[in-house]
């Protein structure tokens, strides 16, 4: 249930959209299996396999982005194209030109696609309409971009914005690494990456290693900055923070696992309980993280405009 990665985006808080409205927006873009000659197909699928494209609970929504892609390695296409080009050269008596080679490659691709295997990949999207968060469970930026593209296509005038905090995450992580501690109930763990901004970008990585203050000071004084930092929030959730505010390796700790509802009788009740627990904890953690980074600048702008 728990998201492993958090690609963060802001929505108006609160965002006055109901699950029924969301369902109507997504329905025209519901996932349909691709044809035999399509390389890729994307769309919205049911998060609970019950036909509904939106799962909702207590002003929290869960969506499921599905991508189906044909596995057709470029090496295979190139190999068949090369063999086909040799045949054509023998027939016509002269070397295949660039344009003809390109056309051959397209022809080979069209011939191989129907026989290629397909893989499906699902990516979850959490929408917190109460606190104004839209979070994509994706480690790769390219995947998050695909999800955002379909969101924008599905929802006309989607009021989506980036997270703009007052303090640079890189500067903050570097300071926390130097002091060995972070504010607001956060602690510094034992994974970090420091990188030089100079030519060559010298990089030092610590994995499961004590971050000694003297070592950190030496690296920072040499011009390195912290680009990744493992942290824990209130002994409840551990994660890795990055310069873009993408949060990776999200892991609920024992105190949260013990808070799971023991009275849940079936899969649906357990899902409801786990989703409520996850969204509640993550919403509080995100609010605390934004706070220790100086607050959300977009909120400040809106408050100033309202005044």
From Swiss-Prot:
Its main location: cytoplasm. The keyword Cell membrane does not apply. It comes from the Bacteria. One of its GO terms (molecular function) is double-stranded DNA binding. GO terms for cellular component: bacterial nucleoid; cytoplasm. GO terms for biological process: DNA recombination; regulation of DNA recombination. Transmembrane segments: none annotated. Keywords: Cytoplasm, DNA recombination. It is found in: Cytoplasm, Nucleoid. May be involved in recombination. NCBIfam families: PRK00321.1-4, PRK00321.1-5. Belongs to the RdgC family. This is Recombination-associated protein RdgC. It comes from Burkholderia orbicola (strain MC0-3). The lineage of its organism: Bacteria, Pseudomonadati, Pseudomonadota, Betaproteobacteria, Burkholderiales. The gene is rdgC.
